[in-house]
């Protein structure tokens, strides 16, 4: 059975999440096209019609990034498939960001990935979306207006896009990793490091995934030329799979994590420990967003069964 609150959540909604340690924000679309925020501050709250931060085309992809929770950016598409930005800065609240004014039109089936660049106090942003020629395009904000960045090449039409960013302690600048799916259904990585720029190689992390499956990624414990990454995607068995990159081991340990509805979107956040939080739809109350957690103390387990407004 559903609940009145769960019925407000769009089935197969885009999902995005940001955090500052265990202070959490989750974004989703309601059945009227509005983007809402649910939050966790020692307990779950909000997600109601009073917590709308933007309006987007129905079925929009969602991406979000934050610097702690002082600056939050949430990305979606307008009815005309133009990239738009809902922005939050502590002290000024939510407002419409400058992105829509740049009029970057993307494919109607594009997904979105976004990151604040790590290791700097400046507000520098990178967004990844799919153009109508099916290439993955980077869009950059360095404080002086939105511009097109590097084009990462052709991908499967409608591919999921995962992205994460950190700064190695021995590197002068941020590192970026972007994951997407190619026409042959491989899940691949493009990489950027400050001393090399974008590497030309595509690194395959999974040989064959369902077409247009959701992809999400996070990282933790950046050190001296070392990083730990977790990449998630929805596999053909209708479960979320996890692919691990661990320092000294590279890509290894690919395993199923938790069941979802067919076509679920996913979002992942993490903090030191590590602690992992994954958000998805698994059929609870039909369309509620559910949570999976991992921590050293308790290992892998389901967290909140249904985020507000579902219960």
Curated annotation (Swiss-Prot):
GO terms for cellular component: early endosome. This is Fucose-specific lectin. Beta-L-fucose 3 binds at residues 126, 138, 198. Belongs to the fungal fucose-specific lectin family. AOL adopts the six-bladed beta-propeller fold and contains 6 binding sites per monomer, each located between two adjacent blades. The 6 binding sites that are non-equivalent, and owing to minor differences in amino-acid composition they exhibit a marked difference in specific ligand recognition. SUPFAM superfamilies: Fucose-specific lectin. The keyword DNA damage does not apply. Lectin that specifically binds to L-fucose and weakly reacts with mannose and N-acetyl-neuraminic acid. Has strongest preference for the alpha-1,6-fucosylated chain (core fucose) on glycoproteins among alpha-1,2-, alpha-1,3-, alpha-1,4-, and alpha-1,6-fucosylated chains. Binds to fucose residues of IgE in mice and human, causing antigen-independent IgE-mediated mast cell activation and anaphylactoid reactions in mice and is possibly implicated in allergic response to Aspergillus oryzae in humans. Beta-L-fucose 2 binds at residues 73, 85, 146. Residues 1-311 are annotated as: 6 X approximate tandem repeats. One of its GO terms (molecular function) is fucose binding. Homodimer. Beta-L-fucose 4 binds at residues 177, 189. The lineage of its organism: Eukaryota, Fungi, Dikarya, Ascomycota, Pezizomycotina. Beta-L-fucose 6 binds at residues 44, 277, 291. Lectins have particular value as specific probes for investigating the distribution, structure and biological function of carbohydrate chains on the cell surface of animal, plant, and microorganism because of their specificity for defined carbohydrate structures. FleA is suitable for detecting core fucose on cell surface glycoproteins and/or a useful vehicle for delivery of substances to the inside of cells. It comes from Aspergillus oryzae (strain ATCC 42149 / RIB 40) (Yellow koji mold). InterPro entries: Fungal_lectin. It comes from the Eukaryota. Beta-L-fucose 5 binds at residues 230, 242. Sequence repeats lie at residues 1-53, 54-103, 104-151, 152-209, 210-256, 257-311. Keywords: Lectin, Repeat. Beta-L-fucose 1 binds at residues 25, 37, 94.
């Amino acid at each position: 059975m559903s609940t009145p609150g769960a019925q407000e959540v769009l089935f197969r909604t885009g999902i995005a999440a940001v955090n500052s340690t265990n202070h959490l924000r989750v974004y989703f679309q309601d059945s009227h096209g509005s983007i809402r925020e649910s939050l966790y501050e020692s307990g779950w709250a909000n997600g109601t019609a009073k917590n709308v931060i933007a309006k987007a085309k129905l079925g929009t992809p969602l991406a979000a990034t934050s610097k702690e929770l002082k600056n939050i950016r949430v990305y979606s598409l307008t009815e005309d498939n133009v990239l738009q930005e809902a922005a939050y800065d502590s002290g000024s609240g939510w407002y419409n960001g400058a992105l829509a004014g740049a009029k970057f039109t993307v494919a109607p089936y594009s997904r979105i990935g976004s990151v604040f660049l790590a290791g700097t106090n400046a507000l520098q942003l990178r967004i990844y979306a799919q153009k109508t020629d099916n290439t993955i395009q980077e869009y950059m904000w360095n404080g002086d207006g939105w511009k097109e960045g590097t084009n990462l090449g052709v991908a499967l039409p409608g591919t999921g896009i995962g992205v994460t960013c950190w700064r190695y302690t021995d590197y002068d600048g941020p590192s970026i990793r972007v994951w997407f799916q190619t026409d042959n259904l491989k899940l691949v990585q493009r990489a950027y490091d400050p001393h090399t720029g974008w590497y030309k190689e595509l690194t395959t992390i999974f040989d064959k995934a369902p077409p247009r499956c959701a992809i999400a990624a996070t990282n933790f414990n950046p050190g001296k030329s070392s990083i730990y990454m977790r990449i998630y995607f929805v596999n053909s068995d209708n479960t979320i799979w996890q692919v691990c990159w661990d320092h000294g081991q590279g890509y290894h340990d690919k395993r199923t994590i938790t069941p979802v509805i067919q076509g679920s979107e996913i979002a992942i956040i993490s903090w030191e420990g590590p602690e992992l939080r994954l958000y998805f739809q698994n059929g609870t109350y039909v369309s509620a967003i559910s949570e999976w957690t991992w921590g050293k103390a308790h290992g892998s387990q389901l967290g909140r069964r249904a985020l507000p407004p579902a219960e």
